[in-house]
């Protein structure tokens, strides 16, 4: 008797599913949906002007539209210091954090092998200035023994200013005393610290400042400079970088490229249009400073440099590793910067 073959619908469904799975696996990553929002974290001052340009000129949105990503929402969130910025990135409240080289290295070290935070790009360089209204203080050693004097930094122990102060202490008194002045430091927003210095009569008598607050302090006649970060490191160094988590980068390759390209374009625009950039800063931040003063700051590369190239960052990494602030010693700056930066002649 002839054997009658039976149909197997279950097998057909399974085969179809397998074909779909193979097809899905072969789809390029760019074909998969990317996020429709980019959230930036920033802090205070002229160091963050490239972000203001990117947001004001809608550079990310324009690039995303050309890349076929549709409408992208771009938001900017302000924080008082590197510790708060890092926490916002870790908690998923922002996608990109703009912070000092110190906070970048702390987060790179903390997330290495897990979340893998690295820098998307460098934004800017400036000499951080330790200013004081205390006439007793002319040099670093004059701080020793003062019981009525506090030094304001954006984040105690974490901010780039806090790290530079430790570097200065090590340079002056040796490795065992790198933390000698840490008990004098307090966390404070730049505008609040400047207000304290200019008002006088408060416990905060020194401020490790950035532009424009350092300019306000020194031109007021009420404060003088003790040292700069360029003095401590022996030359210019990058100050602020933009960093993010590996997962966001891998999940949004086209949008990541748009963000990076936007910052490239913003820095090119600033350097080619410094007066217009100063005007944008004043309008965007609602600054009460005179436009002519902002133009002076933006126009002087010795005081305010906008550059994608990492400079002097390994000096921070080696120092922070030597005092135990980070556990992992990077072999080079490329360890904590994403590969899109690796063609830069960095350091």
Annotate the PLM regions.
Residues 318-347:
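Conserved C-terminal helix/tail region of periplasmic/extracytoplasmic solute-binding proteins
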Residues 49, 53, 83, 87, ...:
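Solvent-exposed, polar/charged alpha-helical surfaces in well-ordered, non-transmembrane soluble domains
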Residues 2-17:
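Bacterial N-terminal signal peptides that target proteins for export
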Residues 34-187, 201, 205-211, 235-236:
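Short, glycine-/small- and polar/acidic-enriched structural segments
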Residues 79-83, 98, 155-163, 191, ...:
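Soluble non-cytosolic domains of exported or imported proteins
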Residues 249-327:
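Secondary-structure end/capping motifs
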Residues 8-9, 22-31:
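C-terminal segment of classical bacterial N-terminal signal peptides
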Residues 191-283:
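Pocket-lining segment of extracytoplasmic ligand-binding domains
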């Amino acid at each position: 008797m002839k054997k009658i073959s039976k149909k197997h619908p279950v097998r057909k469904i399974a085969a179809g599913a397998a074909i779909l799975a193979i097809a899905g696996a072969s789809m390029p990553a760019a074909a998969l949906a990317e996020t429709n929002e980019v959230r930036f974290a920033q802090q205070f001052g002229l160091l963050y002007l490239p972000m203001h340009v990117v947001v004001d000129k809608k550079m990310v949105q324009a690039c995303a539209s050309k890349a076929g990503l549709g409408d992208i929402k771009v938001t900017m969130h302000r924080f008082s210091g590197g510790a708060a910025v890092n926490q916002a990135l870790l908690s998923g409240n922002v996608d990109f954090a703009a912070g000092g080289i110190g906070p970048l290295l702390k987060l790179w070290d903390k997330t290495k092998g897990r979340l893998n935070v690295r820098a998307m790009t460098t934004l800017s360089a400036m000499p951080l200035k330790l200013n004081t209204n205390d006439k007793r203080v002319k040099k670093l050693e004059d701080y020793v023994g003062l019981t009525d004097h506090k030094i304001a930094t954006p984040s105690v122990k974490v901010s780039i200013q806090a790290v530079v102060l430790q570097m200065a202490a090590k340079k002056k008194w040796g490795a065992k005393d790198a933390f000698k002045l840490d008990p004098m430091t307090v966390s404070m927003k730049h505008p609040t610290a400047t207000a304290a210095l200019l008002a006088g009569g408060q416990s905060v008598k020194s401020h490790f400042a950035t532009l424009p607050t350092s300019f306000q302090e020194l031109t007021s006649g009420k404060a003088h400079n003790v040292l700069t970060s360029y003095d401590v490191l022996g030359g210019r160094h990058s100050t602020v970088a933009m960093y993010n988590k590996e997962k966001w980068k891998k999940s949004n390759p086209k949008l990541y490229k748009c963000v990076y390209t936007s910052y490239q374009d913003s820095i090119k625009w600033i350097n080619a249009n410094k007066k217009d950039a100063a005007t944008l800063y004043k309008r965007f931040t609602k600054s009460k400073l005179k436009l002519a003063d902002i133009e002076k700051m933006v126009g002087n590369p010795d005081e305010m440099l906008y550059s994608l190239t990492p400079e002097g960052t390994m000096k921070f990494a080696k120092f922070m590793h030597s005092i135990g602030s980070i556990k992992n010693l990077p072999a080079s700056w490329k360890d904590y910067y994403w590969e899109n930066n690796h063609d830069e002649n960095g350091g």
